[in-house]
């Protein structure tokens, strides 16, 4: 018997599709169903690597964990990773197949993409009871509908009852909903079986007259109003980083993350956001660095271009001065490559071929090449006493070699190519995404920062962040489902 299907689309980007899809996955799984998420095509710089070494959007990995299953490539057969100048890296069935310009994508990849989507759906339909699908952006972009692989084309193919979610916090929610429905084809509009309003602040009763009008005007029931929630889940794209973030008051430590223009895999920071004693700031490169307890240079899709931005804005010099004064810097993936002496791009993969000077803070030379490394890793910590294996994953388009005198530098892990630290414990670099999810390792690293402030150490015998994420998903599902009624729409599936 084929799986039942449910679709979630949004009036805009950032409306809450990923959150709602994750909650529905969790809710159905709690009832004993075998559930899988699905997003035909995703455009995001937050990615995850499956056990088989395939790359998918991190949001689909999060939804898989919500469903209680291991992420796999079939959940997101197409991933587009923007890399500037109107180009994107195309990842099909988990593997890089090329780079395309927006104007050429439809011609070069539409048919191949739709085939990958239908094959993935056929596979999932045979193995699961439910497929919870997520759209992308808006389903009513009339100039793009002929090339839309993600929204109503998938819903129509599956005959899936569809939920339309809208963000009320940005204003204009009724116009967004009615306008979206008006722009859909009649057959597509007939699939919309429910409306969800997300991010509501204030007194619920003040919405009642508007909701009544909405149902009478559209003929579509409102399934619920989700209140504004502090972020319990990983954001899908860097748009989230532009939202004002309240600084945690009374925190012992301040950690500054450089908000690179093409920042990628900033989900690496989520475990720090969950630490009560840590305040995290995402800082644009043109702003003064100040004197935080630590700086993180995160991953980036275009290392060389973002390195140039650091130079042009003066952030490169600020980081060098900060390091010379004993400040702590952790570079992750592309951020680690920047900390080295040089980055070579002989094939011009990121623009003009050449060799570019790094920040010169670590004995590391990186050469970009055509082969992309995407694999999960399990290793042992050498620098900190962590009895449990260190888990993470690599996503990088380049190989790094240690150069010059390595006196005073120590490998972080049993696999020495995965990370390096100086003797003073102030300059850190790693290729491991997800490193800070390893609870004992994260606490040891934070305790090093705390000792410089003469603060007592935190307990290190704590579980992996994945356990904390599971609790958060349960709490999120309980909170959201208290404001939704999905039983009616599920009966239509």
UniProtKB/Swiss-Prot annotation:
The keyword rRNA-binding does not apply. The active site is at 333 (nucleophile), 433. Keywords: Cobalamin biosynthesis, Glutamine amidotransferase. The keyword DNA-binding does not apply. Pfam families: CbiA, GATase_3. Pathway: Cofactor biosynthesis; adenosylcobalamin biosynthesis. GO terms for biological process: cobalamin biosynthetic process. Residues 252-441 form the GATase cobBQ-type domain. One of its GO terms (molecular function) is catalytic activity. InterPro entries: Class_I_gatase-like, CobQ/CobB/MinD/ParA_Nub-bd_dom, CobQ_GATase1, CobQ_N, CobQ_synth, GATase_3, P-loop_NTPase. HAMAP family: CobQ. Catalyzes amidations at positions B, D, E, and G on adenosylcobyrinic A,C-diamide. NH(2) groups are provided by glutamine, and one molecule of ATP is hydrogenolyzed for each amidation. Belongs to the CobB/CobQ family. CobQ subfamily. This is Cobyric acid synthase. It comes from Thermosynechococcus vestitus (strain NIES-2133 / IAM M-273 / BP-1). The gene is cobQ.
């Amino acid at each position: 018997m084929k799986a039942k299907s449910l679709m979630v689309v949004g009036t805009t980007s950032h409306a809450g599709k990923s959150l709602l899809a994750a909650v529905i996955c969790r809710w159905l799984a709690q009832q004993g169903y075998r559930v899988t998420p699905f997003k035909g095509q995703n455009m995001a710089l937050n990615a995850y690597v499956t056990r088989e070494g395939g790359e998918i959007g991190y949001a689909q990995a999060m939804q898989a964990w919500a469903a209680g299953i291991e992420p796999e490539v079939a959940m997101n057969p197409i991933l587009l990773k923007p890399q500037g100048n109107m180009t994107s890296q195309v990842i099909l069935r988990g593997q890089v197949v090329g780079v395309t310009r927006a104007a050429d994508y439809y011609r070069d990849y539409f048919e191949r993409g739709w085939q990958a989507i239908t094959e993935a759906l056929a596979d999932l339909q045979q193995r699961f009871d439910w497929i919870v699908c997520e759209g992308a952006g808006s389903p009513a972009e009339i100039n793009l509908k002929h090339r839309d692989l993600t929204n109503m084309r998938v819903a129509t193919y599956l005959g899936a009852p569809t939920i339309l979610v809208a963000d009320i916090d940005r204003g204009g929610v009724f116009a967004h909903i009615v306008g979206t429905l008006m722009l859909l084809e009649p057959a597509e509009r007939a699939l919309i079986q429910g409306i969800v309003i997300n991010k509501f602040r204030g007194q619920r009763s003040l919405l009642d007259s508007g909701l009544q009008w909405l149902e009478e005007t559209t003929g579509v029931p409102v399934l619920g109003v989700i209140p504004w929630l502090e972020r319990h889940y990983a954001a899908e794209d860097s748009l989230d980083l532009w939202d004002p973030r309240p600084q945690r008051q009374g925190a012992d430590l301040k950690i500054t993350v450089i908000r690179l223009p093409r920042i990628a895999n900033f989900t690496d920071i989520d475990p720090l956001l969950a630490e009560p004693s840590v305040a995290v700031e995402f800082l644009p490169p043109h702003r003064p660095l100040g004197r935080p307890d630590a700086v993180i240079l995160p991953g980036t899709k275009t290392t060389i271009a973002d390195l140039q931005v650091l130079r042009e804005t003066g952030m490169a010099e600020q980081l060098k001065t900060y390091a010379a004064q004993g400040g702590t810097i952790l570079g992750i993936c592309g951020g680690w490559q920047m900390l080295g002496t040089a980055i070579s791009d002989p094939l011009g993969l990121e623009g003009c071929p050449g060799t570019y000077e790094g920040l010169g803070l670590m004995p590391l030379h990186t050469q970009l090449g055509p082969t992309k490394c995407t694999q999960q890793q399990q290793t042992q910590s050498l620098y900190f006493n962590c009895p449990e294996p260190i888990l993470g994953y690599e996503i990088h388009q380049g190989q790094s070699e240690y150069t010059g005198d390595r006196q005073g530098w120590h490998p972080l892990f049993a696999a020495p190519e995965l990370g390096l630290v100086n003797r003073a414990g102030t300059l850190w670099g790693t290729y491991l995404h997800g490193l800070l999810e390893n609870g004992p390792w994260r606490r040891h690293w934070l305790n090093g920062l705390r000792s410089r402030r003469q603060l007592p150490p935190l307990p290190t015998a704590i579980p992996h962040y994945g356990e904390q994420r599971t609790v958060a998903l349960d709490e999120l599902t309980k909170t959201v489902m208290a404001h939704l009624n999905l039983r009616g729409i599920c009966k239509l599936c």
